[in-house]
């Protein structure tokens, strides 16, 4: 590999793998590069640049296919070597709708292979395993046939071979906050093996991908990432790995996990998958609480995430805050996704605080912020829309409808808690998302909130928040139970 800290090797039990050539500290950027090829989901094509993935208010579309969009002429020119064949296929398939992202990525992989046929050889393909599973092989034949037909490159077997490698080695293309953008493939990162307790994580910064260490890694230690959601129970993880990647995981976490389907939470999977409405998800949460289901076990994290989204759809920031606080408090995996949750929790916490402030002081100017301090005279500090989202704050009918007012939670104590969370988030984001736009945005928001709340900064250092967090946790739970 073209990186000084790692090397590709052949390992017993693993075959191909990647090891550290030196000691690597936590939060170290091991690899930073542009992904080799990417393809946006159809829903993102018109609002996202297909080269750099930047979202612009106005994008420029390709004049020929009128489907792929770019943020600038420079990005369009840079993408042309990969778009030229895709463009032809998109025009040919227009009557049948937009080609799916996996088919468009396959066409781009063909061009990558055409430039350097040896580049795909290190990739696992598992073509024999694909052919043994009728449904998987049907997908391979269908996508390969479409790519071959619309590009008029009649090499079906080659496209099938490339599809198998794509299916096993492609990654989800996401934003730094894990919002889905599409699919991508990188010929260096695909050499990393899987673990359900990985020591590295992949972070995207637009079309740039980073491999970042999650903990200290010793020289000659193998580097691992996770191919799947590590918050899922063991039985579901093993099924997903076997179905998509054709292997079973024997990492230490899996080997030491002796839970059964009755105790690992997988029995809730069907109900979670079918619970689309907020009220059904809240009913499921009440059932989990009533049977004493462990807060750190599946499906709590996934369920509370769905509840948060449902509350946001109703513009209920108190409910969204309650769900996310319970989710974040019980999260055993302090990874990049947890950091994103903490950032969203901070933003929702500011929204909740501003709602209380709006009800207590309804005549304040819309772009001013007051936090009454017990030790300092009240001050009015101007802020901006992006920090506290002061416009159109719903009151929900009165202070007793806010989570702080309903449970008599002091606004002063809540602000101190927010400052403590912000300080910890500032340290965590530098480790999880180093040198990314996301990290800069988080740090800027934290800097602004500390400036706005500067009268509290000396107080929060010595404040014991354990009792407060217990009260807040109970309030959040009751808020959802009685919703």
Curated annotation (Swiss-Prot):
GO terms for MF: histone methyltransferase activity; zinc ion binding
Key words, A-Z: Cytoplasm, Metal-binding, Methyltransferase, Nucleus, S-adenosyl-L-methionine, Transferase, Zinc, Zinc-finger
Domain SET per the UniProt entry, residue ranges: 4-228
Record localization: Cytoplasm; Nucleus
Positions contributing to Zn(2+) 1 binding: 49, 52, 71, 75
Keyword Transferase among record annotations: yes
Enzyme Commission number(s): 2.1.1.-
Family to which the UniProt record says this protein belongs: Belongs to the class V-like SAM-binding methyltransferase superfamily.
Protein name per the record: SET domain and MYND-type zinc finger protein 6
Species of origin: Schizosaccharomyces pombe (strain 972 / ATCC 24843) (Fission yeast)
Gene that this polypeptide is encoded by: set6
């Amino acid at each position: 590999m073209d990186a000084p800290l790692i090397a590709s090797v052949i390992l017993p039990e693993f075959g191909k793998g990647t090891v550290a050539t030196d000691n690597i500290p936590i939060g170290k950027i091991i690899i930073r590069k542009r992904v080799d090829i990417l393809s946006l989901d159809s829903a993102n094509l018109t609002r996202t640049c297909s080269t750099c993935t930047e979202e612009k208010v106005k994008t420029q579309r390709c004049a020929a296919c009128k489907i792929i969009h770019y943020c600038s002429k420079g990005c369009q020119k840079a993408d042309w070597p990969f778009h030229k064949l895709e463009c032809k296929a998109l025009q040919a398939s227009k009557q049948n709708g937009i080609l799916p992202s996996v088919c468009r990525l396959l066409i781009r992989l063909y061009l990558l292979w055409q430039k350097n046929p040896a580049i795909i050889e290190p990739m696992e393909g598992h073509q024999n395993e694909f052919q043994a599973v009728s449904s998987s092989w049907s997908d391979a034949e269908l996508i390969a046939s479409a790519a071959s037909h619309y590009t008029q490159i009649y090499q079906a077997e080659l496209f099938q071979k490339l599809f198998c490698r794509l299916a096993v080695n492609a990654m989800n293309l996401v934003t730094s906050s894990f919002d889905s953008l599409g699919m991508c493939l990188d010929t260096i990162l695909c050499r990393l093996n899987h673990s359900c307790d990985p020591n590295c994580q992949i972070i995207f910064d637009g079309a740039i991908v980073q491999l970042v260490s999650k903990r200290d890694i010793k020289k000659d230690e193998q580097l691992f990432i996770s191919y799947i959601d590590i918050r899922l129970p063991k039985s579901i993880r093993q099924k997903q790995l076997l179905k998509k990647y054709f292997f079973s995981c024997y990492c230490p976490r899996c080997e030491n996990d002796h839970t059964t389907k009755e105790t690992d939470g997988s029995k809730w999977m069907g109900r979670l998958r079918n619970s689309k409405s907020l009220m059904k998800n809240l009913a499921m949460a009440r059932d989990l609480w009533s049977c004493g289901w462990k807060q750190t076990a599946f499906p709590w994290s996934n369920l509370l995430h769905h509840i948060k989204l449902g509350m946001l759809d109703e513009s209920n920031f108190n409910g969204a805050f309650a769900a996310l606080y319970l989710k974040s408090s019980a999260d055993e995996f302090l990874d990049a996704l947890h950091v994103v949750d903490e950032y969203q929790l901070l933003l929702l916490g500011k929204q909740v605080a501003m709602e209380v402030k709006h009800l207590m002081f309804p005549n304040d100017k819309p772009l001013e912020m007051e936090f009454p301090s017990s030790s300092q005279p009240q001050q009015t500090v101007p802020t901006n829309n992006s920090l506290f989202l002061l416009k159109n704050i719903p009151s929900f009918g009165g202070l007793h409808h806010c989570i702080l007012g309903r449970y008599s939670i002091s606004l002063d104590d809540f602000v101190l808690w927010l400052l403590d969370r912000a300080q910890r988030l500032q340290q965590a984001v530098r480790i999880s998302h180093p040198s990314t736009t996301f990290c800069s945005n988080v740090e800027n928001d934290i800097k602004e909130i500390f400036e706005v709340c500067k009268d509290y900064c000396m107080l929060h250092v010595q404040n014991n928040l354990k009792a407060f967090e217990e009260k807040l946790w109970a309030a959040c739970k009751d808020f959802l139970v009685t919703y």
